[in-house]
């Protein structure tokens, strides 16, 4: 999956928003054909994807298609598979391994018809129901083109409603589902598990607090619904200078200890062994990749 932290939803039927997206600093964009597009506008949204995806630089465009049960999925796939600039698809409300296999078969057939490399179109599975949470790992490993999970825990969203819980800003009622989705993604060896949207675009402080928690849990990016969320999202999913300094000192101290015949040492009073050194290396490697990506 291409390196990304911020995934901004853009209704694909709104040329004004698509034009604006061309100049925004989000790492990736989700051109939406689903919930943000009214039924009468679905055809216009597909046309918007075809017109604007090729204009985006880099591997930045994903498309959220309509579900298999809507009668719209086939037309969505026919419209977008093979369009230049599209990395892959966000699949909404998936609940079972069989659904993933159906999507995989439909996409694979279109790839063959259109001369694409098998598996070229990647998939992110949106976890938006209790059943989806429980089946998250099995769905993750159902097809090689699945590259990440996306948690759908927005206030009054599908998962919130399915669980029957009362959403709060601190989020304890959603924490189990949020953590289970993260666990399934990591067990499937996905590098970039994605957290859900924060729906109150007026609450900048709440967004930052929730995104900081998201990163502590292990998520590496999230879906966004407003351009104002891009900068704090990119900043908060990036290691801080203090973290980078600490992990650089960890590696330096550990390498020095190994050279002296020891497999452990201490930094700032904390014991450091090979596991901690490997963790430090992962953080520093990720930071270097972000710096290279700009």
Residue ranges, per PLM feature:
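Expand to "…catalyze enediolate/carbanion chemistry for C-C bond making/breaking, isomerization
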Residues: 1-294
């Amino acid at each position: 999956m291409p390196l990304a932290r911020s995934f901004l939803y853009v209704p694909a039927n709104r040329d004004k928003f698509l034009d604006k997206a061309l100049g925004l600093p989000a790492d990736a964009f989700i051109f939406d054909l689903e919930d943000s597009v009214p039924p009468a506008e679905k055809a216009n949204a597909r046309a918007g994807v075809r017109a604007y995806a090729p204009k985006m630089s880099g591997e930045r465009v994903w498309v959220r298609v309509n579900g298999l049960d809507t009668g719209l999925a086939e037309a969505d796939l026919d419209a977008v598979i093979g369009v230049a600039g599209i990395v892959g698809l966000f699949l909404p409300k998936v609940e079972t391994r069989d659904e993933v296999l159906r999507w995989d078969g439909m996409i694979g057939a279109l790839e063959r018809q259109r001369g694409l490399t098998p598996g070229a179109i990647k998939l992110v599975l949106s976890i938006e129901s209790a059943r989806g949470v429980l089946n998250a790992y099995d769905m993750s490993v159902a097809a090689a083109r699945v590259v990440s999970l996306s948690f759908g825990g927005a206030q009054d969203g599908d998962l919130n409603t399915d669980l029957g819980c009362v959403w709060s800003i601190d989020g304890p009622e959603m924490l189990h589902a949020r953590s289970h989705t993260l666990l399934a993604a990591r067990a499937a060896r996905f590098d970039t598990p994605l957290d859900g949207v924060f729906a109150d675009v007026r609450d900048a402080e709440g967004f930052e607090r929730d995104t900081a928690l998201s990163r502590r849990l292990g998520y590496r990016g999230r879906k966004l619904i407003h351009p104002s969320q891009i900068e704090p999202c990119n900043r908060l999913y990036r290691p801080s200078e203090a973290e980078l300094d600490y992990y650089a000192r960890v590696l330096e101290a550990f390498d020095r200890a190994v050279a002296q015949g020891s497999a452990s040492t201490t930094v700032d009073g904390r014991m450091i062994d090979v596991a901690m050194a490997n963790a430090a290396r992962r953080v520093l490697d990720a930071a270097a990749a972000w710096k290279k990506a700009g």
